[in-house]
């Protein structure tokens, strides 16, 4: 994920991060708080569980899954924003695990691209301080709602998969029927980012009732097979496949990236 990334030249400013990047850094801040609380009382089991839950739930099951398309299929600011976020997380995480996984953490540190002032040995680094990436309660509440919506979409996609309507989730086009509050919440995220959040090819927002009822008040979800053809590079379905003569099996976005 960090292949070719140089933190000295490639890091982007905070205002260039996507909201999900800010969410990931806020989750890191919570980890820093919990790990420090464990270390302060020599409760290493608490540190272990905090690190484990962060890596499995916040990162592997969510953030890394959602950002795959941005990392592998695009160039530019979006990709660098994800890499900037992952680099900050990896540096902080390595410092957190150093007291209890000293050899593993040093092996990671040896491979990390360094910035000026970083020590040769991770055990000489100060622990990351809480508050640097903290998010306010409104932001956390917003993303708790977005994740709840995502969970409801996943249920409908599983049903569509069972009914042989789709195979992989990227074969799906999802319509979200919303009341005003849910519509405003979802519409605050760019549609391409919302589709990435759901890991589908297309998302449409509709005010009103429809689709399958969900546990999120004011939300109905419907899934269908996405129109268009499958891009061989990003696996998303698009009507722009073949629009670039030199790359007849790629969507317009991927063709432009390959040509760049």
Name these PLM-found stretches:
Residues 2-36, 64-156, 160-184, 203-221, ...:
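Acidic, turn-prone loop/beta-hairpin segments
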Residues 39-46:
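Short helix-adjacent coil turns
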Residues 227-230, 247:
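Short metal-coordination and nucleic-acid-contact micro-motifs, chiefly zinc-binding Cys/His arrays
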Residues 231, 251-254:
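Short cysteine-rich clusters marking metal-coordination/redox-active sites
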Residues 237-240, 257:
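Cys/His-rich metal-chelating microdomains
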Residues 240-249:
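Short linker/helix segments within small regulatory modules
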């Amino acid at each position: 994920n960090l292949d070719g990334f140089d933190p000295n030249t490639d890091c982007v400013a905070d205002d260039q991060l996507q909201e999900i990047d800010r969410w990931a850094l806020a989750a890191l801040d919570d980890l820093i708080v919990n790990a420090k609380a464990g270390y302060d009382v020599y409760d290493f089991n608490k540190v272990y569980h905090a690190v484990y839950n962060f890596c499995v739930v916040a990162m592997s099951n969510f953030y890394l899954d959602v950002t795959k398309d941005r990392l592998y299929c695009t160039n530019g600011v979006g990709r660098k924003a994800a890499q900037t976020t992952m680099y900050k997380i990896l540096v902080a995480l390595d410092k957190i695990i150093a007291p209890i996984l000293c050899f593993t953490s040093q092996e990671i540190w040896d491979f990390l691209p360094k910035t000026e002032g970083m020590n040769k040995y991770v055990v000489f680094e100060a622990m990351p301080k809480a508050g640097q990436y903290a998010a306010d309660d409104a932001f956390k509440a917003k993303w708790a709602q977005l994740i709840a919506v995502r969970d409801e979409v996943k249920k409908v996609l599983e049903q569509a998969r069972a009914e042989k309507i789709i195979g992989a989730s990227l074969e799906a086009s999802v319509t979200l029927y919303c009341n005003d509050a849910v519509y405003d919440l979802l519409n605050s995220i760019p549609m391409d980012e919302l589709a990435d959040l759901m890991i589908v090819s297309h998302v449409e927002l509709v005010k009103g009732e429809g689709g399958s009822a969900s546990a999120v008040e004011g939300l109905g979800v419907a899934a269908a097979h996405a129109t268009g053809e499958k891009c061989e590079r990003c696996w998303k379905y698009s009507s722009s496949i073949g629009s670039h003569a030199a790359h007849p099996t790629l969507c317009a976005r991927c063709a432009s990236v390959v040509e760049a």
